[in-house]
Amino acid sequence: MKLCMRPLWLGGLCLASFALSLPHTAQASAAPQLTTETTVDDLQTIQLEAFHKVIIMGNLQVQIVQKKGKPSLSLPPGNHLKEALEVQLDHRDGTLSLRPRKGKEQTCENLPLYLTVNELTDLEILGGGDVDFPKGIQTNALCVQVKGSGTVDFEQAVQTQGNLSLQVMGSGHIELEKGASCLAYEGRINGSGTINTEGKLRCTSKLNAEISGSGRISFEHIQCMAQNIKLQGSGKYYGIKVRASTTQVNILGSGEVYLAGKTHQANYSVLGSGYIDALDFQSEQVEVDGRNPRSTIRCHSDLIIEGKIQNNCTLEYTGKAHLNLEVQDGNVRKI
């Protein structure tokens, strides 16, 4: 499969339009049609064909706004931008890619880009790019991946009819300033990155949060059917105001989980030196599994606490719960 490039010179900016030479049995997608115009803000605007996936490479600064009409990319005019930015539009899967050209990375670092989209289902940041959503976004489903030290900031609420997936691989950061609503939520960190959600997160079904490494996931307000938390390493999870029917917490390592709010049924498992503080997390039924001398589980129950506490693991609890515990060299006390 050959990659053919046809450069387009637009107002001093060179954009590479790509088309793939496919075998004769397959039809190659047409090259994207791009035009330019000058807006009232004297920005150079490039009209784009439809896409729903965006990949941003390098240390670009991009502001994304959802609006009706033809999608576009706007940037300040000037001959110094010549050959600085490479734009690819792949018709096969509807992907728009933005990246600095080789040797032009410093030119693009301070280059503000303004991208308008109709529909956005996937956003991928490769490197240290900064992406900002100043307005709310509505979509069927959304997957955001930060691979590196990049940042994604949603200044207004995110609304999806389906799943909302936020993933950080590295030291990057994702911020939901006004919360979100979705069918199901997935937050995943592999590394030292962070995912922070202010406002209210409403999940019709389940919330899954997973940290591998030293990352942090925090929520200001959660409403969901099922809350599932898994930590491997030294990561931290914060759920401040939680309303969930069921809650499952699994810690493999020295991770820490802090919960407050209310749930009907909770299951807490620590198989390392981890720490769970759920004293302010009201629950009727609690099941515990602690097996390490440096691990601590703190919980609240007004009905029953059952399970195993072994090897000098410490269980501290509040409430009127009946205890049905198998204790082997463990520490259990009411506080």
Regions found by a protein language model. Name each.
Residues 2-12:
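Bacterial N-terminal signal peptides that target proteins for export
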Residues 12-13, 22-147, 151-169, 173-190, ...:
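Acidic (Asp/Glu) and glycine-rich low-complexity loops/linkers
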Residues 216-218, 222-276:
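Eukaryotic tandem repeat interaction scaffolds
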Residues 259-299:
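Intrinsically disordered, low-complexity segments enriched in Gly and acidic/Ser/Thr residues
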Residues 305-307:
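Extended, low-complexity amphipathic alpha-helical repeat segments
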Residues 313-316:
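Short, exposed beta-strand-loop hairpins at the edges of beta-sheets
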